[in-house]
Regions:
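Active-site- and interface-proximal helix/loop "cap" or "latch" segments in soluble metabolic
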Residues: 22-117
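Helical element adjacent to the flavin cofactor pocket in flavoenzyme catalytic cores
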Residues: 255-313, 353, 357-359
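A glycine-rich dinucleotide-binding beta-alpha-beta segment and adjacent secondary-structure elements
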Residues: 286, 475-558
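An anion/pyrophosphate-binding glycine-rich loop and adjacent beta-alpha core
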Residues: 349, 353-471
Length: 584
């Protein structure tokens, strides 16, 4: 018996040794945010040697750190029992699952992470470094500032507290308001102007914005858009514009893909081409001032380690707002409490505003917090697929009635929705509208996700829509018939739709449920028209600039749609050039 057992044990040991005698590669599949993630994993003696990403449909910017840094960590730790990448949770889980699936197929059991190996894999950074310009925040404003500073001859570094770049600039629709843009003449729009754009912005913010700053934004918008198109290579739709609420003209350029991915991928490529270091996971903690009161650097932390970035010319703040910080939102506007979700990126939490305040900057208009009216009731994210609203989609309450002009200001729409039964609405459009907006085609992953969630459907007729939404059919049909009877500009007797209603008599139809969600914080650092940070008494803080949502004087009480990208490009460029000049 013992002899037999010995033979069996020897055979087992031989088989086990043979199993790991040579490297083996197996494929595995996991589910990410936007579909399957397929990998090929090479094992040698039971340890991961290499991971190749074979297939995925994830956002290339958000997923970049997952498929680089996290992938390398898995190899170094020989484990999937690691923290995922913040802001890319579902993609991280999908990669973990795919690697585990491959391991199972290879007969390999992955255990706890090898922390020593993981620590050794972390790249060392100098604890004290000097640059001409330090830019904090790697969104649209930060990249614009860093690129312009570099092109002005400055040695520049871009710091980002999150594992990936982009922030709200990445996940937004990224439309950009530009008066007298190159698409307007194709649509017969010949009477727009920077002055009219400025007037719309000022009135849209209830006359609380700084008109000097607004005029700089609108008068530099075209140059900014041409810089994006011609220098960065950003592609815009050639023959279509968005008509956002509160504007008197259709003027918003639309990036290819209808999201900020087009911008951020091109920003990243240009930063790489220019050799601009982009350091992620680096959180700014405190601005450094010299004895004369000039900002000359920033103290930051990464994984508990302190770093100092000295800035000869100065620092540019481009960190966005605080819409993803519920406590801060409620502090400044108690009406927007825990019931509200947010459209914002996870890193939009506002700590840098207090950092700027400690350095002497005045914070203004902090109580003005915008909600976006058309968002996912479950997650709070913007329903970009419902941007068909800008081309004629209508908003209905549970009773099947229109209740507001669909192109009204965001705050007006949000309040109107909250006044309806259940505090939600339905957005309805047909193929005629869809042929112009192309939102279903441009956002297929949204369509799949919202359909699976049960908040969206496609129907051949209104009876099907009524069954799905539980709206009384007679009421629904009556509203659609009335809309059709008033099709055309100037014919809306009910709510005076500024662009004109569209014939909705024929399907097929699309409908989605929507609620308001926290979207943009108008308050922030007080700046002047040169993007310089100011004290409460209006004095310039030497060496400190700010651009984008971190500032608080451009949009007044309410930001008009499409103005965020105009803001970040224009003032990011101004701030970067000025900081570089100050270093000379």
């Amino acid at each position: 018996m013992k002899f037999t057992q010995s033979i069996f044990a020897a055979a087992f040991a031989f088989a086990a040794a043979a199993a790991f005698a040579a490297p083996v590669t197996t494929q595995g599949v996991g589910v990410g945010k936007h579909g399957d993630i397929q990998v090929a994993v090479t094992f040698d003696n039971g340890k991961i040697q290499k991971i190749d990403i074979l297939k995925n449909a994830e956002n290339p910017v958000l997923a970049k750190k997952v498929f680089t840094d996290l992938k390398d960590q898995i190899v170094a730790a020989n484990s999937v029992q690691l923290d995922g990448i913040s802001g890319a949770t579902f993609t991280s889980k999908g990669l973990f699952a795919a690697v585990e699936d491959a391991a199972k197929k290879a007969g390999v059991t992955l255990g706890q992470a090898d922390k020593k190996a993981l620590k050794a894999a972390v790249k060392d950074l100098p604890k004290n470094a000097s640059y001409d310009v330090v830019v904090i925040g790697a969104g649209g404003a930060g990249f614009s500032a860093a690129i312009e500073a570099k092109n002005a001859g400055a040695n520049v570094v871009l710091l980002e507290k999150m594992p990936q770049v982009g922030g709200n600039s990445l996940i937004s629709g990224a439309e950009m308001n530009v008066a007298r843009n190159w698409v307007q003449p194709k649509l017969g729009i010949t009477d727009d102007s920077p002055e009219l754009h400025a007037k719309d912005t000022y009135l849209g913010g209830d006359k609380k914005g700084d008109m000097k700053v607004i005029n700089v934004m609108t008068h530099n918008a075209l140059a900014g858009a041409e810089w994006c198109r011609d220098y960065l290579g950003i592609r815009f739709e050639p023959d279509n514009l968005f008509f956002f609420g509160g504007h008197s003209r259709k003027r918003a350029l639309i990036p290819v893909g209808h999201t900020g991915t087009e911008f951020i991928t091109k920003f990243l490529a240009k930063a790489d081409e220019l050799g601009i270091p982009v350091i992620t996971n680096m959180k700014a903690e405190e601005l450094i001032k010299d004895k004369a009161g000039r900002v000359v650097g920033v103290k930051a932390t990464m994984n508990g380690t302190e770093y100092t970035f000295n800035a000869k010319g100065g620092v540019v703040l481009a960190t966005g707002g605080f819409g993803a910080n519920p406590a801060m939102v409620k502090k400044y506007n108690p009406k927007i409490d825990e019931r509200f979700k947010t459209t914002d990126a996870p890193g939009t939490t506002g700590e840098v505003l207090y950092m700027a305040q400690r350095a002497g900057a005045e914070l203004v208009n902090m109580q003005y917090i915008q909600t976006y009216p058309i968002c996912d009731p479950i997650s709070g994210v913007i329903e970009l697929i419902a941007d068909a609203r800008f081309d004629g989609a209508i908003m209905l309450n549970q009773e099947g009635k229109r209740f507001v002009e669909e192109l009204g200001r965001r705050d007006v729409l949000s309040e109107a929705i909250l006044d309806q039964t259940g505090g939600y609405c339905w957005v309805l459009w047909n193929d005629k509208i869809g042929a112009v907006s192309n939102t279903v085609k441009e956002h297929p992953t949204e369509y799949d996700a919202f359909t699976k969630q049960g908040i969206m459907t496609t129907c051949p007729d209104l009876k099907c829509i009524a069954d799905f939404t539980k709206i009384p059919y007679d009421s629904l049909k009556g509203t659609v018939d009335r809309v059709t009877s008033m099709a055309g500009k100037g014919n809306d007797k009910d709510f005076h739709h500024r662009a004109g209603l569209v014939d909705m008599s024929q399907g097929q139809y699309y409908v989605i449920k929507a609620v308001p969600s926290v979207h943009h914080t108008m308050g922030g650092v007080r700046i002047n028209e040169k993007a310089q940070a100011l004290t409460a008494d209006g004095k310039v803080i030497p060496g400190l600039w700010a651009a984008g949502e971190v500032t608080g004087v451009t949009h007044g009480t309410n930001r008009l749609g499409g103005n965020a990208y105009t803001d970040i490009i224009v003032f990011g460029r101004i701030a970067g050039k000025a900081a570089a000049e100050a270093a000379k």
